[in-house]
Regions:
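Membrane-integrated ABC transporters
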Residues: 1-36, 54-57, 79, 139, ...
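An intracellular "coupling" helix at the cytosolic face of ABC transporter transmembrane type-1 domains
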Residues: 11-19, 103, 120-129, 180-181, ...
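Transmembrane helix-loop-helix hairpins at lipid-water interfaces of multipass membrane proteins
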Residues: 15-71, 150-155, 270
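Transmembrane helices of ABC transporter permease
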Residues: 24-30, 37, 44, 133-184, ...
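Hydrophobic alpha-helical segments in the permease module
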Residues: 60-72, 164-166, 240-252, 270-294
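Cytosolic ends of transmembrane helices, especially the final helix of ABC transmembrane type-1 domains
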Residues: 211, 283-311
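Helix-to-loop junction immediately C-terminal to a conserved catalytic motif
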Residues: 369
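C-terminal portion of ABC ATPase nucleotide-binding domains
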Residues: 508, 513-554
Length: 554
């Protein structure tokens, strides 16, 4: 029974795609069987030449060599294809689990670290299948070679068995220390990749601050630790190869010397001596795999890193459908992160969420859209707890726009229509994006990668994407912070006419003034829920917006 999540993952990988795993195993077993038959036929051919035996033995020997070549070719074709299929499945499982992680669970792993796990560690884990098949083939070959040695002369088997326990202890000693070193190496590598991703994301800020050297030093701060772990693993592998290369030839010499003695004594024919020499080398095949054992240790280390992510609790979707409703949002006894107990957002209302930076505006929206689950209490949409709503129903009911919207590869139309494919141009017009999109070289068919967009234009496309979906709950997380005042006026008018419940996290007094209600947050949770005009009499509230003037309604 597998003892750890990593061992379970390796076992599941071996048993995934069982048909092709069996084919790969049969190819390795077939190669081992053919290899075992080769010395016997070679012995017959040698004896036939020296004693005038069956001349057809040479032809059978040539046929067996041809079979071995064909089996090798088939294995070289099947193994990479099957491994790549397993890698694809592991990457799909890992990426799917990451996408289901809550915000807090996801924050544990940096983007660069997850990229390393996704691109590198999955390949290392998938390699366990050909490793296992090859090891089983080697085991059968070694066992068959030992039986063949015993059948030729029992003393040959005794000579081999005298040194086998020593080799076993050497391999077990070194491999047991290799896996932790591999894990350390991969962990440090992931940490470096994470910091590199952060720097590349903020590259303009780094250059503007003249901080290139400082950031390079920060990214590579763990390089000595990476060097230490890598050097230790390579030294360990070198020592394993050294010890094996010292012990194995001595045992093989003992077997060959015993065979030579029995040949001189007349107990063996020249052909049997030739076969015994070949079988002695085959019997060591199981032990003479230092690189394979180190690869297995690397696969286990990769499995630990994948299992670390896969065993992190993901958001579990419910199974209920949402009833027809206006999009009323209710917080009941919600605690941690933030305190939003007994807060109700009326269906169809436009509600501004304001507060100082760090007060919990984004957290409130994440709870409302179930990107985050509360530690206590429930968040309900039209009377149904979000924990119980199915993934499909929730995706259809909630639409998002973010401060820094991300676009998938594709065209501008694809970016706006992502998730729905409907109302693309109408949504772009509502978000005041249609005009600048039409100026692009190919309009809505312009690839996102070829569209030089400002921060405000990107935000308008993100808002258009949110408006393109017929959702009952629209969540805008500082989604118009980079647009100019005139554009913001038109957007706020479009939002005011939208039938969905709109929850808008903002730092702008103009948006708060146009909302039906304002939810004012401080570090402890909800401080007040009231119209903007009712809150303006409080100095702390006015201070949230600095010197921004009240909007002129036109």
């Amino acid at each position: 029974m597998p003892r750890t999540p990593a061992d379970r993952l390796l076992t599941e990988t071996v048993t995934a795609g069982p048909a092709w795993s069996v084919v790969l195993l049969l190819l390795d077993v077939g190669r081992s069987a053919a290899a075992l038959a080769l010395p016997a036929l070679l012995a017959s051919a040698v004896d036939a030449q020296t004693t005038g035996g069956d001349p057809g033995t040479v032809g059978r020997l040539a046929g067996l060599v041809a079979v071995l070549i064909l089996l090798d070719i088939a294995s070289l074709l099947v193994s990479p294809w099957h491994v790549n299929t397993l890698v694809l499945g592991l990457r799909r499982d890992l990426l799917g689990h990451v996408l289901r992680l809550g915000v807090r669970q996801r924050a544990v792993f940096s983007t660069g670290d997850l990229t390393t796990r996704l691109l590198t560690n999955t390949g290392e884990v998938a390699s366990v299948v050909p490793l296992a098949a090859g090891w089983i083939g080697s085991l059968l070959m070694s066992g068959g070679a030992l039986v063949a040695l015993a059948l030729i002369d029992w003393r040959l088997c005794v000579a081999f068995a005298a040194g086998a326990p020593i080799v076993t202890l050497i391999i077990r000693f070194f491999v047991g220390r290799a896996s932790p070193l591999m894990t350390d190496y991969m962990t440090v590598q992931g940490s470096i990749a994470g910091r590199l991703t952060e720097v590349l994301t903020g590259l303009r800020s780094v250059r503007a601050a003249g901080a290139e050297r400082r950031e390079i030093d920060r990214v590579l701060a763990d390089l000595p630790e990476l060097h230490r772990a890598g050097r230790a693993s390579w030294l360990l592998q070198g020592r394993l190869n050294l010890h094996a290369s010292l012990v194995l030839p001595l045992i093989q010499v003992a077997v060959v010397a015993t065979a030579g003695y029995t040949l001189l004594a007349g107990s063996l024919t020249p052909g049997q001596f030739t076969a015994a020499t070949a079988y002695a080398g085959m019997a060591f095949g199981l032990f003479n795999q230092a690189n394979a054992f180190m690869a297995l240790a690397q696969a286990r280390a990769g499995a630990r890193r994948l299992a670390e992510v896969l065993t992190t609790g993901a958001t579990t979707p419910g199974s209920r459908e949402l009833p027809a409703g206006p999009g009323e949002l209710a917080f009941r006894g919600v605690r941690g992160p933030g305190r939003y107990a007994d807060l109700t957002i009326p269906g169809g209302a436009m509600v501004a969420v304001v507060g100082e930076s760090g007060a919990g505006k984004s957290t409130l929206l994440m709870l409302a859209g179930r990107l985050l689950d509360p530690d206590e209490g429930e968040v309900l949409l039209d009377g149904v707890p979000l924990r119980e709503v199915s993934e499909r129903a929730l995706a259809g009911a909630v639409s998002w726009a973010f401060e820094r919207p991300a676009y998938l590869p594709g065209t501008i139309a694809d970016a706006i229509g992502f998730g729905s494919g409907e109302r693309v141009r109408e949504a772009a017009e509502l978000a005041r994006a249609d005009t600048f999109v039409r100026r692009l070289p190919a309009g809505y068919d312009t690839p996102c990668a070829d569209a030089p967009l400002s921060g405000g234009e990107r935000q308008r496309l993100g808002l258009a994407r949110a408006l393109a979906r017929p959702a009952r709950l629209l969540l805008l997380d500082d989604a118009v912070s980079s647009v100019d005042s005139v554009t913001e006026l038109h957007i706020s008018r479009a939002l005011a006419a939208h039938p969905a419940t709109r929850l808008v996290a903002t730092h702008r007094a103009s948006l708060a003034a146009r909302a039906d209600l304002v939810v004012w947050l401080d570090g402890a949770g909800v401080r007040a829920v009231a119209p903007h005009a009712d809150l303006l009499g409080q100095d702390d509230y006015r201070g949230l917006f600095g010197a921004e003037r009240e909007p002129i309604h036109v």
